Design a protein with these regions (language model features):
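Post-signal peptide N-terminal regions of Sec-secreted extracellular proteins
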Residues: 32-129
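Secretory targeting and sorting signals
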Residues: 1-33
Length: 129
């Protein structure tokens, strides 16, 4: 095999590795965007008229993000997580993509999740007990 053929095969191999790496990074970024920065597995989805609050759990920690149903300009959004016996941890402001993530250590305690986009909201009651 000539040196030209070897160079072509090396170039092809490098291109395949680069493409595979790019796909892996894209998939990771997509998963990160879907979770809004929360670690763990999704355990609840709390839909409401103008958005959805996603709840994740891992190793005793509970995390939540609120995402609007439709993209658009910045608007008032919030997400709140309260472990039973503690004060709620809240992220409230004007965002265009999501509110949160908000993470609390719940251990084996129940949590109360709230989310809002504009005037519409959701409140879970005590869950994950």
């Amino acid at each position: 095999m000539g040196s030209g053929a070897i160079r072509r095969r090396l170039a092809l191999g490098a291109a395949v590795l680069a493409a595979a790496g790019t796909l892996a990074l894209t998939a990771t970024g997509t998963a990160q965007a879907a979770s809004g920065g929360c670690a763990g597995r999704e355990v609840r989805t709390l839909p409401f008229k103008t958005g959805v609050t996603h709840v994740y759990k891992r190793d005793g920690y509970v995390c939540a993000v609120t995402v609007p149903r439709t993209p658009g300009p910045a608007r008032t959004m919030s997400v709140s997580v309260q472990a039973r016996g503690n004060r709620p941890v809240v992220d409230r402001g004007r965002y265009n993509r999501l509110a949160g993530p908000v993470t609390v250590h719940a251990g084996h305690r129940c949590v109360w999740i709230k989310g809002a986009v504009g005037r519409d909201s959701v409140s879970s009651g005590w869950i994950l007990c």
